[in-house]
Swiss-Prot record:
Protein encoded by which gene: infB
Record's protein name: Translation initiation factor IF-2
Phylogenetic lineage: Bacteria, Pseudomonadati, Campylobacterota, Epsilonproteobacteria, Campylobacterales
Region (G5): 482-484
G3: annotated segments: 392-395
Region described as G4: 446-449
Length: 838
């Protein structure tokens, strides 16, 4: 039988290798390390010594000492265990255990199995280990000893004869694996069974502990034991708990309604597919998306075809489309005539605001910075007992969106053209806006009081745009006026009222109001303020209103002169105070019945716009991705824009976004209506080289101090084109300068001189301009540039000179070049850097 190693014995008994090694040395075994092996007989002695704490006697003296009086108590007790079980238990209980168990969890659990155990024997029981490979752990089934302890004890009680060791004992096997069937080659010898019962525990408790210990042993050895199948069964049982794949649901889907605005993961849920499948399909089609991106209509249709599902695209904006809900509401028709809304448009400085000033008997133009209109204004004028609402729009090119907005809410458009200036770009643009809105156009030829006035020039220019006067057979009224003297103003107003009668403008004043925001701002002490024109219904103080993402209750109404109003009727304009935030210019405002309804509309619109913006920032095609990678060297100027009103802010943003090229662009990191706040300074300081641009606003003392502390530059303007020009200058400074060449002169080589330790010196005659020392030169041979470099030395006779003019001879040394030939030309030039202008 194979020898047993010290560490195997230590593992069985639950002691450390060091402790068992010391015990073995005490017994006189020749062992040095835990890997040292002992014979099965020595192993049995070591078991006895560790369990009982007494050294075994030598075989020669054992029979003699058993009869002596010194060993009388123990010897008598050891001869009786076969006769009475009780005496054996008492003897075992009285056996002292000198070695304390270790505190480690594994050692404690192992030692608890051995406490109070003894090898039942007559004279000497030699314990033989299982004859298996030494790498096999001996403790695999040691717990099984407890399962067979009762039966073995009964067998021992029946056997009256003392146990005599025979030659067979050398091949006896310990019953360690009786509870678990690992293989068929392990058997039990009834005569030579070693049992280690815990006699301090009742048999029932032993049996119960057996079951628990078996379960623990199986759990601990399941990962290392290839024969242990319980863990595998558990894993198989876990695998049964799988998510149910809804293949039947996928087969049942043949058509589905898809919202017009839907994110990718929502679309995947609708068609019972995973988001990864949809993303993979789009990637194959050349579109990189994330699960939160919105899908376009064509993408939805293509995906439906790819998955074999018929998709019906429906519009879900109805959830927050309060305008449609307003229009769908059927009420009794109590329509009455309303005031016409007239928009004045035209080129900058052609007299639009001056015309309105004369009509209103006011001086609005004098209050505008730079003498140009930079806000959309709405004014009420009474003529012949009838009200007319005028909208004054800016003529500067930056206010395209304002002009388009003014044309969309109007009934009649007056195009003002200066008689001394003719048709200009913004004149053409205004006409296009009016035609797009489908509203009548009246041409006012202004500045007729000037000597240089030429109305025919205006008519000819407009004829090229298909705007023909009635006297030329066209359908447009041309009215010569002077906003300065008042010539033709009455005629113009008469034509406006006549045109309004032909249009039969009507509205129902008895229902909830519907209005259009033409301008909005944030005013100190008043909060968000909006200028609106009521199209239908009547807006009253106390009404609950919603305008895009803004909502609230009307706290006050004012006319264009600042007078308080109780209500605004259809076709009239006024200033509304009481909104939760500044609404976008051009937004539609309606009255609703409850605050809850208004809040829900505004919140849904806000959530929709926010998700739309987030999705827009993440969408990118493969081609766009390549372009973005190529933009690694693209420079940008970060700016924060603050303006007094929404319309001006919109115009500034649109103008600055156009200021870009392949090298540089404007990066608007934040914009808003109202004054410059400390949070704006904090944001600007977090971005390198960020500039704050203010329009018609001024920073306060605290803001100025914080900006100075953080070195944030604030620039304020009251004329929009000054702001744009300054930004252009800033961008030009960031752009790479244009490098141009300036030719200085030319010389021809007459003789080449080789100077030792220096190289070649060219004897030249300056034929044009001058040759300068340190200047850049080119060596030209037969019209081809063969070298470019710098002049290293320039001499006239033996003197060093800085410059040699035309007609003089000189000696020229070229840095790093020694291949000059007679007849070559030396061209001198310098590089000049110039700033780029956008």
């Amino acid at each position: 039988m194979a020898n047993i190693r010290i560490h195997e014995i230590a593992k069985e008994l639950g002691y450390s290798n060091k402790e068992i090694l010391e015990k073995a040395k005490e017994l006189g075994f020749k062992v040095t390390t835990s890997s040292s092996a002992v014979t099965p007989e020595d192993a049995a002695q070591l078991y006895d010594y560790v369990q009982s704490g007494k050294k075994p006697e030598s075989p020669e003296k054992k029979d003699i000492k058993q009869n002596t009086q010194k060993e009388a108590p123990e010897t008598q007790t050891q001869q009786k265990p076969i006769e009475q079980e009780v005496e054996t238990k008492q003897n075992i209980d009285s056996t002292p255990i000198k070695v304390e168990p270790k505190q480690e969890s594994l050692a404690s659990s192992t030692l608890s199995k051995r406490r109070g155990l003894v090898i039942v024997k007559k004279k000497k029981v030699e314990v033989q280990p299982i004859q298996k490979q030494q790498s096999e752990p001996i403790n695999k089934g040691l717990e099984a000893i407890f399962g067979s302890s009762d039966e073995n004890l009964k067998k021992k009680k029946k056997e009256k004869k003392p146990i005599i060791a025979t030659k067979k004992e050398n091949s006896a096997k310990i019953d360690l694996l009786s509870a678990i069937s690992f293989s068929d080659d392990i058997s039990i010898d009834d005569e030579d069974v070693v049992v280690l019962p815990d006699l301090t525990v009742k048999p029932i408790e032993i049996e119960r502990q057996n079951t628990v210990k078996k379960q623990i042993n199986v759990y601990k050895t399941s990962q290392n034991n290839s024969f242990s199948f319980e863990g595998g069964i558990q894993r198989n049982s876990r695998k049964k708990h799988k998510k149910v794949v809804k293949d039947k649901d996928n087969e049942d889907i043949s058509s589905v309604d898809i919202p017009k605005e839907i994110r990718l993961y929502e679309f995947a849920d609708k068609i019972k597919k995973s988001s990864s499948e949809v993303i993979a399909k789009l990637f194959i089609l050349g579109k990189m998306t994330t699960k939160n991106d919105f899908l376009e209509e064509d993408e939805i249709e293509i995906l439906g075809a790819e998955f074999g599902i018929e998709v019906n695209i429906v519009d879900t904006k109805e959830d927050f489309d309060y305008v449609k809900a307003y229009e769908d509401e059927i009420l009794e028709d109590n329509s009455v005539s309303r005031a016409p809304v007239v928009t004045i448009m035209g080129h900058v400085d052609h007299g639009k605001t001056s015309l309105l000033d004369y009509i209103r008997n006011s001086r609005v133009a004098s209050g505008e910075a730079g003498g140009i209109t930079q806000h959309v204004g709405a004014y009420m004028v009474e003529k012949s007992g009838k009200n007319i609402t005028f909208i004054d729009t800016p003529g500067h090119e930056a206010f395209t969106a304002m002009r388009a907005r003014g044309a969309s809410v109007t009934d009649i458009v007056i195009i003002v053209v200066a008689a001394d200036d003719g048709v200009k770009p913004q004149t053409k643009e205004a006409i296009n806006h009016a035609k797009a809105a489908g509203v009548p156009i009246i041409i006012a030829i202004n500045k007729m009081d000037k000597e240089s006035a030429n109305p025919d020039l205006v008519k000819t220019g407009l004829a090229e745009l298909d705007i023909l006067p009635t006297e030329w057979g066209g359908g447009y009224e041309f009215v010569p006026i002077s906003a300065k003297t008042g010539i033709g103003i009455e005629d113009l107003l008469e034509i406006v009222l006549l045109q309004a009668e032909l249009l039969e403008l009507k509205a129902n004043p008895d229902r909830e109001a519907k209005a259009t925001i033409i301008e909005s701002s944030l005013q100190k002490g008043r909060g968000p303020v909006a200028t609106a024109i009521v199209e239908n219904g009547t807006l009253r103080v106390g009404d609950t209103i919603v305008a895009g993402v803004a909502y609230g209750k009307v706290r006050a109404l004012q006319d264009d002169k600042g007078n308080s109003l109780k209500s605004i009727k259809p076709g009239e304009c006024g200033v509304i105070i009481g909104l939760s935030e500044v609404p976008d210019a051009g937004e539609t405002l309606i009255s609703v019945k409850t605050d809850k309804e208004a809040r829900e509309y505004a919140q849904k619109k806000y959530d929709y716009l926010r998700q739309k913006e987030l999705s827009k920032s993440t969408k990118v095609t493969i081609d766009e991705l390549s372009a973005k990678i190529a933009e690694g060297e693209l420079k940008s100027l970060p700016v924060i824009i603050k303006a007094d009103v929404q319309g001006s802010l919109e115009a500034i943003k649109a103008s600055l976004e156009k200021l870009k090229n392949d090298e540089i662009k404007v990066d608007i990191i934040h914009s808003g209506v109202g004054g410059i706040s400390q949070s704006d300074i904090t944001l600007a300081s977090a971005s390198s080289n960020c500039v704050i641009l203010g329009f018609n606003i001024r920073p306060t003392g605290d803001v100025k101090e914080k900006a100075k502390e953080r070195s944030v530059e604030i620039k304020t303007y009251n004329v929009i084109y000054n702001l744009i020009d300054d930004v252009k200058a800033l961008l030009s400074g960031l752009m790479s300068p244009i490098i141009s060449e300036e030719e200085l002169g030319q010389a021809v080589i007459r003789q080449v001189i080789n100077v030792p330790k220096i190289g070649q010196i060219a004897g030249c005659m300056v034929t044009d301009g001058s040759i300068n020392r340190g200047a850049k030169i080119r060596v030209i041979r037969d019209g081809v540039v063969v070298f470019e470099g710098n002049v290293s030395s320039l001499k006239r006779f033996k003197d060093d000179v800085k410059e040699v003019a035309k007609g003089y001879e000189c000696g020229v040394g070229i840095e790093g070049y020694n291949d000059m030939r007679e007849g070559d030309y030396i061209e001198s030039y310098k590089e000049v850097e110039s700033k780029v202008e956008l």
